[in-house]
Amino acid sequence: GIMKNHYKALSAIPKIFYKQNDNDNAKGSDSVHIVIDPNGGFQLWLGEAKFYNSLEDARLYEPINSVEQMLRKPIMKKECGIMTNLNELDKQIENQTLLKKIKECFDENTSIDEIKPKLHIPILLLHECQITASTTEMSDEYKNSIISFHRDRAHSFFKKQINKLSSVHKYSEINFHLILFPVPDKT
């Protein structure tokens, strides 16, 4: 929903169809979307999503490790291969010139290095939050508290991510988006 409604993204791979069983996670990224630029270009969005009971520092390594796995050549090639072999984009993109350009970009012969500048990685961390649990209305006090808390967690997350992933080739050309979503509790 966030990808479609906020970023106007097109679903490129319906991940639900690639689960092996009910308790299985989708392999590779959790979501695969294409965002069309107003100037006729496009971006590849490979998303990661986690649900935590807290955002303490120790929990932040798991999504970073998942992103590291996602950036490995075999996994990125697999995602691109699935995308070009499905007709999901054919149903959503009427501009045939753009569709051809997208499919050529994700062709098996295209270097991953050519894809990385088009790559966006949204990382959604849905988390239990005491600030949200103790709030009954959307007050300025609540907004300021949650902004301050999320800013602190985002700084910690990106510091850890840079330390772990900055050696990935063309890391600086990849766009990362951290989306922190507080909920009162899991139930």
How would you label these PLM feature ranges?
Residues 7-24:
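A short acidic/basic microdomain associated with nuclease active sites
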Residues 60-147, 155-156:
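Acidic, metal/cofactor-coordinating or nucleic-acid-engaging core segments within structured domains
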Residues 3, 31-33, 44-51:
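Conserved catalytic cores of phosphodiester-cleaving nucleases, focusing on short active-site segments
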Residues 1-7:
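Long, mid-chain structured domain cores
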Residues 23-35:
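Charged, often glycine-rich, active-site loop that binds/positions anionic groups
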Residues 45-51, 55-65:
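Metal-dependent phosphodiester-processing active-site neighborhood
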Residues 37-42:
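Short, solvent-exposed loop/turn segments that connect beta-strands within catalytic domains
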Residues 137-187:
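Extended, charged low-complexity segments
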